[in-house]
Each structure stands twice: as C-alpha cells, then as structure tokens.
C-alpha cells in the first residue's frame, strides 16, 4: 500500500506542481489567475479520466465524485485548497486535494463503489494571498460568503475580484450560494507547517483543534518632511511609531509564551525614499491562540497600546480588523476514530492542535470534521523550501485512505 502511494505521488505531484511553478523555484498560484485556472482544468481532466464525475460550482470549487450504492445522498468529502501564497511551496493545500484523489482512486480499485458517496474537492481559495478575503472556497460551500464583501475589492495591481473571476469563466453571484446539506463528513489531509511532528520523530498528527486568529491592517498617518531639515523632536515619523509598536508588542507576546504567536508580516512606509521622513506607514498584524478569550484580550490590549503610542507621538491611526476567527474544535467522534485507526495500524502519531488556519475550520461547526497532519521538514512552509519526506507523504495518503474506507465503504 505504501509502495503504491509512494509511486503515485512521485508521478502526480510533480505534474500538478508544474502549473504555477516559478522559474526561480517555488509556486505562485493565486485565485482566478491563469495559473489557477490551468491547474483546476488539468486536475479536472485527470480526475475525469480516472472515472470520477467532475464539476465546478459557481465560484470555481472543483469536485470529483464517486457515487455510493446504498447511501448516495450522503457525501464523505475530502480535499483542500488549490491556491498558494506568492512564491510558496508545492504541498500546502494542493497535496490535500491530490491525496484525496489518490486515496479514493485506490479505494475504488480495491473495493469498487462505496456505500456512501465520496468526493474530492479542490477548493478555489483559502490563503487570502491575492485579494483581502480568506476561505472564499469553503465559505461558498456553506453559503457563508457574501458577494457584496468582494464586489469592489482589488488585488495589489488594481485588478478587481469581479473581473478576475470573469476572466476564468465564473460570474460573481448576486446572493450567497445555497448551502450544501449532503455532506456527512469532511477529512482534510495537510502538511503540519511546523516542526512538532518532525522534532518528535512522528509521521501522523491527529488534529483536535485549530487556533483562532485575528488579522489587522493598520495605517499610521504622520507628516512627510525633509530628512535633513526636520529636527528629531519635530518629526511625526510613522516608521518610528511602527517600530515602537512592533517592539513592545513582540516582547509582550514572548512573555505570554506558547501557544500565542504574533507576526508583523507586511510593512509599507510612504514615500519610502531615503531622504524623506515617512509620513504614512501601513502594516499587518497576525495573532493566533487556541483560547478565544486569551486571543481577544491580548489583541484588545494590543489595540490600546498602539493608540497610546500614536497619541504620544501625535500620529493618526486607523485599525482595520479584517479577520476574526475563533478557535475551532474537530469532531470528537472522528478524532477518536482516527486515533483508533492510528493505534490499530501501529502508526507513530500524536494528537495536536493546528497553529495555522485551514478550510477544516469552516467545515467543523457545520459537519463532522477531522484533520490529518504529516510532517514538514524543518517546519518550513509558505516557502519554496517546503518539503515532506516521500515516505511521510505516502503514510499520510494511506491514513487518509483507511479513514475514508471506514466512513464511506463501511456501514
């Protein structure tokens, strides 16, 4: 079984990774880009050739379906997102979709049609890398995405969401999509994107919860002025204000300790030239924790601290909290089933939380959901150096296949 999956991965992963590959290494496959469209179209053809019924929904989520014989109206769904970050790796997201297809294809060959319908899903978007919106794919599955929230947004190059969508053959709906009611379970395989499994020599992670996270875009408004003729005491320097905010906040996060994490990931000073005091600086904040109350309290204090620093320095501040996701537990019964499977197969595993957000957190409050983690070499992800040992990749697909067998092929 491992040998089969290893060979299948060695053949299909480079193929799927060729769509959106950067010449200098890594991958860039942003929502509704030509690379994104080519990937979805080619994956659709490959799944159809293997005997699955394929279709796109209204926003570009791709499905490959194998109908059940006794409970065709009950769907066991598996997959992940197909988009990437800019210059990312070839495992985050897409390997979960690929693994679902490989697992279902093997199960079909070994056992024939399932009792319950099984579907592969390659979700349109999760990362928020092109447009300021996340989980567009999974939110649309449950009618949670409001078209008005994306109708007027643009990417960094000024391309509108609506136009990008049209260029790929899709039309923005006028209202939220009708939620799917037929999904009875969702299983997502994903790389850990951290170093816990590798550090402990373990090949499988059974995820019991996903951290909550808050993301901000903050804009500081001071005054641009001549760098040589403006004395230090007369400046309204937004980069200096940012540096104070960053240092103070990171030190507080360090004192708080795990599992809290805080990141200032994007900084844009203006006018961004050597001889002008920066009068405007925009930056992002990403904060995560497994406890909703701790996350809320820490970020509220962070907002208060930022305002206090800006008041002291006569700097205007605009704080936009554009993502607020609470921690999400996985389904206890599915976690128990997956844990029992790992024990039965004598897998080297651990039960753990996810420090990253995943599509599973959109599914979990609505349908029974679980996640399987596989190790990330050196804990690296969102990076061209993102890697997982081929044996661990195959072990992950095997574990997924066994889980899907229990959910869809057994009563």
What are the functions of these language-model segments?
Residues 2-33, 124, 382:
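N-terminal capping segment at the start of a domain
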Residues 9, 15, 22, 79-80, ...:
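Zn-dependent metallopeptidase/amidohydrolase metal-coordination segment
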Residues 21-67:
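A non-catalytic alpha/beta surface segment that caps or lines the substrate-entry region
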Residues 29-32, 263-272, 284-290, 316-335, ...:
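A short beta-alpha structural unit
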Residues 38, 210, 226, 230-256, ...:
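His/Asp/Glu-rich mid-to-C-terminal helical/loop segments that flank catalytic regions of hydrolases
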Residues 44-48, 53, 63-164, 395:
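Active-site metal-coordination/substrate-binding segment of hydrolases
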Residues 78, 88-127, 214-220, 226-252, ...:
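Alpha-helical metal-binding/catalytic segments enriched in His/Glu/Asp
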Residues 125-126, 130-292:
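Midchain, well-structured core segments that form catalytic/ion-binding scaffolds
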């Amino acid at each position: 079984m491992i040998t089969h999956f290893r060979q299948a991965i060695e053949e299909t992963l480079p193929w799927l990774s060729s769509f959106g590959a950067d010449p200098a290494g890594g991958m860039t496959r942003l929502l509704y880009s030509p690379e994104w469209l080519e990937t979805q179209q080619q994956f659709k053809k490959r799944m159809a050739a293997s005997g699955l019924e394929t279709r796109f929904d209204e926003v570009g989520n791709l499905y490959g379906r194998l109908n059940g014989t006794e409970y065709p109206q009950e769907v066991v769904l598996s997959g992940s997102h197909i988009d990437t970050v800019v210059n990312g790796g070839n495992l985050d997201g897409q390997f979960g979709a690929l693994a679902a297809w490989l697992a279902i294809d093997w199960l079909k060959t070994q056992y024939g049609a399932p009792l319950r319908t099984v579907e592969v899903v390659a979700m349109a978007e999760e990362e928020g890398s092109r447009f300021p919106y996340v989980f567009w794919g999974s939110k649309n599955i449950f009618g949670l995405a409001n078209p008005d929230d994306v109708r007027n947004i643009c990417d960094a190059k000024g391309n509108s969401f609506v136009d990008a969508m049209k260029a790929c053959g899709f039309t923005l709906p006028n209202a939220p999509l009708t939620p799917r009611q037929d999904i009875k379970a969702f299983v997502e395989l994903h790389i850990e994107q951290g170093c816990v499994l590798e550090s402990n020599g373990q090949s499988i992670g059974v995820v019991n919860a996903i951290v909550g996270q808050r993301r901000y875009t903050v804009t500081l408004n001071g005054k641009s002025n001549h760098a040589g003729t403006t004395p230090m005491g007369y400046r309204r320097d937004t980069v200096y204000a940012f540096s104070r905010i960053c240092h103070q906040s990171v030190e507080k996060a360090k004192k708080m300790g795990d599992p809290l994490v805080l990141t200032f990931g994007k900084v844009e000073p203006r006018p961004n030239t050597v001889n002008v005091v920066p009068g405007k600086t925009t930056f992002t904040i990403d904060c995560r924790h497994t406890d909703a109350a701790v996350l809320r309290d820490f970020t509220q204090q962070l907002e208060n601290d930022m305002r206090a620093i800006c008041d002291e320095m006569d700097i205007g501040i605009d704080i936009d909290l554009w993502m607020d996701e609470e921690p999400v537990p996985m389904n206890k019964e599915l976690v128990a089933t997956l844990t029992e499977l790992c024990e039965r197969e004598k897998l080297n595993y651990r039960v753990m939380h996810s420090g990253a957000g995943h599509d599973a957190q959109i599914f979990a409050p609505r349908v029974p959901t679980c996640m399987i983690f596989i190790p990330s070499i050196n804990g690296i992800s969102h990076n061209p150096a993102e890697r997982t040992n081929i044996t661990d990749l195959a072990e992950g697909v095997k574990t997924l296949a066994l889980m899907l067998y229990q959910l869809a092929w057994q009563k």
